[in-house]
């Protein structure tokens, strides 16, 4: 079964803003072992303090792939100096639908 994995990563280390969304994405690509994801900047609260954050959404096409990503999250947290990274793993139906050529569409 496929899964959707959503990470929410704060930009602060302690009370100091340290990262931008683009930097969080670079680290995520390097440390999570994924080749595709969608990211958006947001803000949230951590221990009662407002903090800019990045949400990263990924698709895992199997339970094993989802677990492999989840298992790398503590390393990402360590590299970014985070106490924790919120990780949501939800069952989902994900498929990648490839484009058709114009000729194939006209014949249909």
Predicted feature descriptions by range:
Residues 1-108:
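Positively charged, small/polar-rich N-terminal and surface patches that mediate targeting and assembly
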